Amino acid sequence: MADSYTLGIDCGGSKVMAQSVTYNSITGLVSPGDFQLEVNYSDSPKWNSKFIPVHLDLQRQEFSEGNIYLTQPEMDQGDVIVETIQDIISKSESDSIGLCFPGIKNDRGVVIMANGPRIPDLLERIQGIDSILHDSDCCVLGEWKSTIGKLQNCDNALYIGGGTGIADGIILMGKMIDFNSRDDVKRSWELKMPSGETIESCLSPKGMIEQWNLSQREKVKTLDQLSKNKNADTIFEKAAEAFLFLIQNRARFFKANHAKIEKIVIGQRLGIFMADSKLISLLESNTDIPLDYSTDRRTAALGAAWKRICS
């Protein structure tokens, strides 16, 4: 029995995905509704495709000191993101909205952002939004609490979503963990391999593409383009190493909490690419934990809608 309606909005590093849902109060799951809209920030003539975020160390310092000094490029880029969200909400005509966003948030906005502009006043600029959800959490919730999810009925599972960055998710003993409230587990952008590189820079689609473009004359824009180059094998091998490093780290976390990973779901652009690529064999040879690949890009929006309804 579908008895509730809301809109989920997933704000990524390069686009916004909005999806309406129906909620079933008996199963506790959401299902995709009729309204769906995906908008690239680059559709705006004001979008700066060459935007470079403020160095993370400086972002952390400014946040800890309570004084965030936005650069003009940050403000301009943030304006495009806010206008895109506002336009989507207007078209949806929904007054029940769940919105998720990458980066570190406080109760007003986005205060630390690895792959985009900080928007510390985001909440007050978007009508109808009373909180900003974590994108990683919503990716997991969309897989766990929607009728199209790959993590339904899982009690101990791992989610790895790859796009502009890496979306980390852990379900431990039937509950989704909060990375911000624990000191015994880190996100992929905080985890460094022996080489000094982060998991995120080696495993995310953006990271793999940047590695290639920094070292080659022939530039690529997608993982599909990258995979057609024989010289890219070393990049995919490094991604496999990063994956193994991450899985070993997570396995230790589960063991310390008296549990065992029963399933790993790889999603977002990384999941779509891997579902039909040679990277699968590299990853599957490194673990005996069952792997599944989520190719539906709506899951974070579905998770945001579920969170809005069930909070």
Task: Give the residues covered by each predicted segment.
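Glycine-rich phosphate-binding loop and adjoining helix at the ATP-binding site
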Residues: 45-55, 67-86, 90-156, 273-291
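Glycine/GP-enriched mid-protein hinge/lid loop-to-helix segment characteristic of carbohydrate kinases
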Residues: 5, 17-59, 128-133, 146-234, ...
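Conserved Rossmann-like nucleotide-cofactor binding loop
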Residues: 14
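Adenine-nucleotide phosphate-binding core of ATP-dependent small-molecule kinases
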Residues: 61-95, 209-273, 290-300
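Conserved glycine-rich phosphate/nucleotide-binding loop
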Residues: 2, 285-311
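Short glycine-aspartate micro-motif
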Residues: 6-10, 96-98, 156-161, 265
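Residue-level signal for short, function-critical loop segments
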Residues: 103, 163, 270
